[in-house]
Every structure is written in structure tokens, then in C-alpha cells.
A protein has these predicted regions:
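Bacterial Sec-dependent N-terminal signal peptides
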Residues: 1-25, 615, 739
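Patatin-like phospholipase
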Residues: 19-61, 69-371, 375-388, 392-394, ...
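Outer-membrane beta-barrel and related beta-rich outer-membrane complex signature
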Residues: 242, 478-480, 520-526, 573-577, ...
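Gram-negative/organellar outer-membrane beta-barrel architecture
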Residues: 364, 369, 375, 381-553, ...
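C-terminal outer-membrane beta-barrel translocator/porin domains of Gram-negative envelope proteins
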Residues: 407, 540-545, 549-670
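Short glycine-rich beta-strand segments
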Residues: 471-475, 515-519, 564-572, 618-622, ...
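Flexible, solvent-exposed loop segments that connect beta-strands
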Residues: 480-486, 524-530, 577-585, 643-647, ...
Length: 739
């Protein structure tokens, strides 16, 4: 209960008279769990620091455990607050892998499907023990506590510490005070059905808040004479707040903890209850407000902390000095162990990480190595423990959880151009050959697409790959004259390719390749200009790609480049070209060089506003134009053969052998997951004919205004667009992610 300051002074005087001079009353600090609300505890730490009050023992649960452990390991309240404000909580509390961590071979496939279901023992697995595995959270916690890697007994921390977890099998309390501190903290905050359970000491552990959310008994057992307890929860919900089955289950889950709280509360000497009723455990979007409430409460208790500190200090005994964290600390790793591998080998894992023994590593370097391995998508979770061998060296133990070898993925996609389609993908690793990825994808619906690919990793660190694949696209396309629909035809496009690629890190990849294409045309609505039949060609090319985007969907920062320089030859045809129903001479089929470029850049401006720009260019270096090889202009999204996107015109409205386009855009958040996107673009076509020294070309300009919303199964975009040349206001609807 909240004792008066006078009583605390009496207690201090008692210790002054009854103990030797070397004794002083021990101060215990207990922090409750509470998810995002638990960050308000930081305000109490700041007030304690300002008052000069020295804490001797700390206990905590869930988020209270994390805040308490940071303080126990040597961070100040101010330092903890600064770190919390810089954290990307959306990334930490999700299963998303940072796009920058993915290998270049995996980036284009990441987040293309709404659902990814593992296939284990030939069965599709739907659910795990928790939705979020928390790999990024694990990495962040490990980094923050790297400076105390050599401490495996939490009593040896600068301030002795314990945290609470629950045994998932028995429902009993588990007090964690030894071992890997990152694992202990992750266990303490593993909210059932939200975070996956943590394997530790032959147990499956979940959030300690189920049985003891306010562990005052434990800090008393550690030796605390005076206990400061900070609680951010409000206990069981009133009956009028229980409105659905989920509320019922949550209420029942905390019955046991509610009874325990009644025993914990009387053991506090200074009880602090935070006024955070308007927030909940998931209010990480309101961190600044929660921190402000914590600071306000801390300031209100500062006078009490100050008087208590002065009373204790008057006893003439100073507590031991706490060393500050050594932020740039490195450790010399002489031994490496890996546990948990069944589908892949230890050499393969270490090569992916580019990790060697007998080298110095910082926390950031180890985190980068872990992300590099996880970026291959062979692994779903990687944690590590450092065990000191000598004063200057350590053994590192990687605890690895592998992804299942195979996944079934699915999504839906709609545009007026493609119609509505179901996208289905089966991806399997090491199916035929070790160190490989095989993939088969289908888009089934109003249009038909297919892709099959085999990727074979080569080289010690798997930065070289051989890629073989085939694509098919069956699509109805409108033909245009003067920006008006004139007819339609069905295009069947087949492509086989072989690439030899080298990736320099996770941002850049280049290589050489060859492809063979076959295109078949069949008019479905007759038009002024018609093509019927098929032709094929071979292309040999060099390519260079770069991708530093921070996320796949609606990126905020980064650069993406796709460049290709190729030579088209061995064109074979069986075509008939008609003009107003009269057959005309065949198109030109001479060999030619082809250059294409697509670059996008995203720059954060302010308050979530993102400026973006895209440059596209394509040139066929030939003086005899062949419309079948031209670039097809139009469409805001999507991808089909030779497309150059242009806001203002539908897909394939215009074609040209030489195109250069610039788009500028602004994306403005309006509510959570919703944006207004404005685009303006200009395009120059037909600027190079190569049978004259110059060509003025033709300019196109267009605009689009889009409302975009991120749904759980993909983006929904509703656009109005206009072109100065087409002179028509048109709608453009997209739902889902293109195939």
C-alpha cells in the first residue's frame, strides 16, 4: 500500500540504529506488465534518477521486465526513453523481415501473397502457438543487452533482476533469473496466441502476466526492505466492457493473476498506478503520449523519491557504483555452435551468415549476420547466446528454427486490364538439389499467367546463383487509335530464360542471361491494324539490379533500379499484318540492340509524407521499326511484356520503339493504413529513329489522384486519371498485388 513518507523515515531510522553502519535499507522496484502501456514505467525511472535514489533489486513482467532489465543492466531512464522513441515498433512486433535484409533473389517474391501456409509432412499447417515469432524483437533485445553477455546469473547484473514467465504446459509461474537474458525477456512477454511460445530449459514459456503480473513477492524475497511498485494495468474488466467471445477469453485468462495481485499489492511501500485507461496493450502508435503520462506521474512522485533518497543517504553509506553500458563493446569469438538444424547443414548456415570464428564481433555485426541468413528465407528464427571462455574470448551458440521446406501461398488481384484472378504459388527449397529454390506460380481467372523457376545457389557464401525459368501470359489486350479503343486481340506470350547472377550483399545483383520468346496474336475484335500469327526471338543480355527499399508495399525510403542491355536476334515469324483489312508487307526482323531502364526513389518528407519519383526508359536501336517489339505505354500498376507505366492512359494505349518517362508523386497518410497519392508524369516517345540524326519525338502528359488502403489481403487503390492527349477522365481500380 502507499505508505506515508513519515513511516518510511521511521523505517530508515530503524535501520540506522539497529544495523551496523555498513547496512542500509534495500530499495526494491517492481514493474507490471501491460504491453505498450508498460513504457510509462520509464517516467518513474527518470524521476528516481533525478532524485538520486539508488535501487537495489528489480522485478518485472512482460514489458515491465524489459524496462526493468534495461535499467538493471546499467542504462539510465533518459537513455531508455531515447532508445524507445527510436525503435520501429511496427517492425519489432511483426513477422515481417526488413526488406533490406532479404537477399536479392528473395525480394521480388516477398509479400506478393496475402497468405503463406507451411507444408509439413505433406500437410498444410494453418496455425502456430503464436502469430508473431518476433525475430526482430529478439535481435533488438540481444543487441541492447550485448554489454552483459558474460552475465548468466541475473543477480550479477549491476542491479540484481528477476522476471516472470508462465509454463504453457502446467500453467505455473516460472521465475527467470539465470541463462540468456534476451531469451528470458522474450519469454516474459510472449502473450499467448499473439507471440509464439519460447522454448527454454525444456519448457514452453509464455507471458508471465497470466499468473503474476506484479511480482512484488519476488523482489521482497530478493531482500528488498522498501518496495516501489508501478502498475499500468486496470485489473479485470467490468461486465459492461465484455462484449464478445474474445473479451470473455481474455477475462478468463487473467482470473488467476487477479487473485495473485490482491496478495502482491499490500507488500508495496510506494504504490504507483498509472492513469492510462484510454490506452491498451497494443497502443504502440501512441508511445509519445504514454511516455508523457509516465513522465507526468514520475514528476508527481519525485518529491517522495527525493526525500527517501536523502533519508537513506543520511545514513552515511553509499551503494555500489553502477558501471554504464559499453555501447561499442566487441567480443572475440573463438568457438561457434549451431543447434536446431535439420533441413540445412551447419556449413551452409554459417556461409550464408558469412560468419567465422577467431574474429571480433559487435552486437550490430552479429545482428547483420543473423539478418543475412534469415534473408535467405531458409530460417524463421535465429537467436544466439554468448558464453565466456576466458576474460577476452567467448563461444557463440546459434539457436536456429528453420522454415519448413515448402510453402503454399495465395492471394487475389484485380484490375480492369487483368480482371479478377487468384494467384497461387508453391515454393520449395532443396527439393531436387541442395542449396536450391523451386517455385511454381499460377494466376487463374479472367487472364492466365504461369511461372516456374529453379534457383541454384553457388559459391561459399551463396552469393552466386544459376536461375532457369519459364513464363506464360495469356491476355486480352485492347488496341487503340488516337487514344480510343479500336479493337482487341488475344496475346499469348511464352518465355524461357537462363541467368547467371552474382549478388553483392543484399542490395545489388548483376548477371548475364539468355531468353527465348514466342508471341502469338489473334484478333478478337477487328480493328484498323491487325496482326495474326506468331513470331519468336532470342535475346542475350546483361542486367544490373539494385534495391534498398525499406518495405515492399508503399515504401518510405530507398532506391530501386532495374536495368538491362540486350541483343535481339534469330527472329522467326509466321505473321500476317493487315491495314484496313488489306494485308501489308511484313514488319522488319533484323537483329538489334535493346536498352531498358526502370528506377524509383522514395524520400520521407515529414509526418509520414513520402515523395517519390520514377524514371523509365526503353530504346530499340534499329532504324527499321517493328511494332511487335515496341514498348507498350499505359497503366499505373502491373507488369506485362514491354510495359512502360504511365498515369493517365490505360495499358497499351500507345506504343513506341523509343520511350523516356518521368513521374513525380506524393503519398500522404490520412488515417491508419490509408493514403492519398498524387502523381504527375511526362513521357517522350519516338525520339530516336536511327535513320536520321535527330528526331523531335512526341510528348505525353498525365495525372492521377489515388485513394489507397492497405487491407489484410493486399492494397485497394481507387484512382482518377487524366491525360492531356487522351482528353478523358478515366477510373483505375486495383485490388491485391500483381502476379
Amino acid at each position: 500500500m502507499k505508505f506515508s513518507f513519515g513511516l518510511l523515515c521511521v523505517m530508515c531510522c530503524f535501520y540506522a540504529s539497529a544495523q551496523e553502519k555498513s547496512a542500509r535499507p534495500k530499495i526494491g522496484l517492481t514493474f507490471s506488465g501491460g504491453g505498450a502501456k508498460g513504457l510509462a514505467h520509464i517516467g518513474i525511472l527518470k524521476a528516481i534518477d533525478s532524485a538520486g535514489l539508488k535501487v537495489d533489486y528489480i522485478t518485472g513482467t512482460s514489458m515491465g521486465a524489459i524496462v526493468g532489465a534495461l535499467y538493471a543492466s546499467g542504462y539510465s531512464g533518459n537513455e531508455i526513453e531515447k532508445m524507445v522513441k527510436l525503435m520501429d515498433w511496427d517492425a519489432l512486433l511483426s513477422n515481417n523481415i526488413p526488406l533490406q535484409s532479404l537477399s536479392m533473389e528473395e525480394k521480388e517474391q516477398y509479400k506478393r501473397y496475402a497468405v503463406e501456409l507451411p507444408i509439413i509432412n505433406k500437410k498444410i499447417r494453418l496455425l502456430q502457438t503464436g502469430y508473431i515469432q518476433g525475430q526482430e524483437l529478439n535481435s533488438e533485445i540481444s543487441k541492447l543487452f550485448f554489454h552483459v553477455y558474460n552475465i548468466h546469473n541475473f543477480n550479477d547484473l549491476p542491479i540484481p533482476f528477476k522476471c516472470m514467465a508462465t509454463d504453457l504446459e502446467t500453467g505455473k509461474l516460472v521465475v527467470l533469473d539465470t541463462g540468456n537474458i534476451a531469451s528470458a525477456l522474450r519469454s516474459s512477454m510472449a502473450i499467448p496466441s499473439v507471440f509464439s511460445a519460447v522454448s527454454r530449459d525444456n519448457k514452453k514459456l509464455v507471458d508471465g502476466g497470466l499468473v503474476r503480473n506484479f511480482p512484488v513477492k519476488n523482489v521482497k524475497q530478493m531482500g528488498a526492505d522498501i518496495v516501489i511498485g508501478s502498475n499500468v494495468t486496470n485489473g479485470l474488466s467490468k461486465i459492461d466492457k465484455i462484449k464478445n467471445p474474445v473479451d470473455v477469453l481474455m477475462q478468463m485468462a487473467f482470473f488467476k493473476e487477479s487473485e495473485d495481485f490482491k496478495e502482491e499489492l499490500p507488500l508495496t511501500d510506494i504504490y504507483i498506478h498509472m492513469p492510462l485507461e484510454k490506452y491498451n496493450t497494443a497502443s504502440f502508435g501512441s508511445i509519445d503520449h504514454i511516455l508523457a503520462e509516465g513522465n507526468k506521474t514520475g514528476r508527481s512522485y519525485y518529491p517522495q523519491f527525493k526525500r527517501l533518497a536523502d533519508s537513506i543517504n543520511s545514513l552515511g553509506v553509499s551503494p555500489a557504483k553502477i558501471d554504464k553500458p559499453f555501447y561499442n563493446k566487441s567480443v572475440f569469438v573463438t568457438e561457434v555452435e549451431v543447434t536446431g538444424l535439420h533441413l540445412t547443414s551447419i556449413p551452409f548456415f554459417l556461409h550464408l551468415m558469412n560468419f567465422d570464428d577467431h574474429r571480433y564481433y559487435t552486437a550490430i555485426q552479429i545482428s547483420k549476420s543473423v539478418r543475412r541468413a534469415q534473408g535467405s528465407r531458409y530460417y524463421s528464427g535465429i537467436t544466439y547466446t554468448l558464453e565466456p571462455l576466458t576474460k577476452d574470448s567467448a563461444r557463440i551458440i546459434f539457436n536456429v528454427e528453420e522454415n519448413p521446406a515448402s510453402f503454399l501461398k495465395a492471394g487475389i488481384y484485380y484490375t480492369k486490364f487483368r480482371g479478377i484472378n487468384a494467384n497461387i504459388n508453391l515454393t520449395s527449397r532443396d527439393f531436387f538439389i541442395n542449396n536450391s529454390r523451386d517455385m511454381v506460380s499460377f494466376s487463374l481467372g479472367e487472364s492466365m499467367q504461369m511461372e516456374a523457376e529453379h534457383l541454384q545457389y553457388l559459391g561459399r557464401i551463396k552469393n552466386v546463383a544459376f536461375i532457369a525459368g519459364a513464363k506464360m501470359d495469356n491476355q486480352d489486350i485492347s488496341s487503340y487509335v488516337d487514344y480510343r479503343i479500336d479493337g482487341a486481340y488475344r496475346q499469348k506470350f511464352y518465355r524461357g530464360y537462363l541467368n547467371f547472377q552474382n549478388s553483392g550483399g543484399n542490395r545489388i545483383a548483376g548477371g548475364i542471361g539468355a531468353s527465348i520468346e514466342n508471341i502469338r496474336y489473334h484478333p478478337t475484335i477487328h480493328s484498323m491494324t491487325e496482326v495474326q500469327g506468331n513470331f519468336s526471338a532470342i535475346k542475350t543480355y546483361l542486367y544490373l539490379n539494385y534495391n534498398s527499399l525499406n518495405q515492399a508495399l508503399y515504401p518510405v525510403r530507398g532506391l530501386k533500379l532495374i536495368t538491362e542491355l540486350g541483343y535481339v536476334y534469330n527472329q522467326k515469324h509466321n505473321l500476317q499484318l493487315f491495314q484496313n483489312g488489306v494485308q501489308v508487307a511484313d514488319p522488319n526482323y533484323d537483329n538489334f540492340t535493346r536498352l531498358s531502364f526502370d528506377g524509383s526513389v522514395f524520400i520521407p518528407i515529414h509526418s509520414g509524407i513520402t515523395l517519390f519519383s520514377e524514371i523509365q526508359a526503353g530504346v530499340n536501336f534499329t532504324d527499321k521499326s517493328n511494332v511487335l517489339n515496341n514498348f507498350q505505354i499505359g497503366g499505373i500498376n502491373g507488369n506485362f511484356r514491354n510495359q512502360v507505366r504511365f498515369a493517365g492512359l490505360p495499358e497499351a494505349s500507345v506504343n513506341s520503339p523509343a520511350v523516356a518517362a518521368l513521374q513525380l508523386g506524393l503519398r500522404i497518410p490520412v488515417i491508419s493504413n490509408a493514403y492519398i497519392i498524387a502523381r504527375v508524369n511526362a513521357l517522350l516517345k519516338d525520339f530516336a529513329t536511327f535513320n536520321t540524326t535527330t528526331s523531335p519525338g512526341t510528348w505525353l502528359t498525365g495525372y492521377a489522384l489515388t485513394f489507397a488502403y492497405k487491407t489484410p489481403i493486399g492494397p485497394l487503390e481507387l484512382s482518377a486519371m487524366y491525360s492531356d492527349q487522351g482528353k478523358r477522365l478515366q477510373s483505375y481500380v486495383l485490388f491485391g498485388i500483381p502476379f
